Amino acid sequence: MNKTLKFVALAGASLMTSFAAAAPNPATDARIDPHVRAFLAEINKDSSPFWELPQPKPQDILTALQSKTPVDMSGVTTTEKTITENGRTVKTYIMKPEKVSGKPGVLLFIHGGVWLVGNFQNHQRLLRDLVVGSGQIGVFVEYTPLPAAKFPTQLEESYAVLKWVSEHAEEIGADGGRIAVAGNSVGGNMTAALSLMAKDRNGPKIGYQILMIPATDASVDTKSYHEYGTGRFLSRSFMKYGWDLYAPDEATRNNPYVSPLRASTEQLKGLPPALVITAENCPLRDEGEAYARKLKDAGVQVDAVRYNGTIHDFVLLNALRNVPSTQAAIAQATAGIREHLVP
């Protein structure tokens, strides 16, 4: 097996677990789209836990998996930019649509990957789809990954970029008064937390938040975790591994900036409109939907949609880009961005 293919195999291994699952074998589960089943069959060939495998750096594992599928990266131009704000220096990537009508707003994107395996390289296709579909300028936060730093570093870096964008958007040709924030998986966690933080700190104003298959609680103990926590790309054990590094102190996990689901109704009041996307066969499904309900109970305008037949991070995975559920979710997200950011 050559090096590239080896890393593709490790990508599947990185997200497997030995926990028993209540759901049927994903290879035969009729609730899963056939294209998704084929993807799972390929990555499930190696069942070794990610953290026991050698790798030059964790991000290379997901990047190798993503690189296996050719994708369309046309219609955008991307530049790297390092910003300094609030005493923090953060690398970002600025992605501009080639076709722009008027002055665009900003889509601040916070990536997933359990704070370990994500980066711009393996998330750029998703950001490209959101930028082209919405017509807004994307700003990708390349926060410090685990284990180099833990909470609140990654969130504070994201807030620093949000603040910089609101004050310096003219430098990238955007309107800093129109900002949406989006994130997938733990990026969805930090999108929710950043919305709370911006409210608590009286700005910058966020006009729209998009939580894609978000992690909203550190407990790792919902019904969907136990039902779908093995064999479906993201595992319960891998999430627990990430949480133990990100927020090792149990007391810290009660902080709404760590577990947004534990925020009080009062704390959630006044948050920006939200789109919460979940997947039927995803360990994070229950907590994402519970957070959407809690937002609604707090009077927040929220659209919550579960996409059946698919798995965690389906919007991110290049191999699933042309599956109807992925296309529909991205179309829904970009429509929401346009609705809330386009004057």
Which residues make up each language-model segment?
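Alpha/beta-hydrolase superfamily serine-hydrolase fold, recognizing
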Residues: 25-343
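Gram-negative bacterial Sec-dependent N-terminal signal peptides
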Residues: 1-21
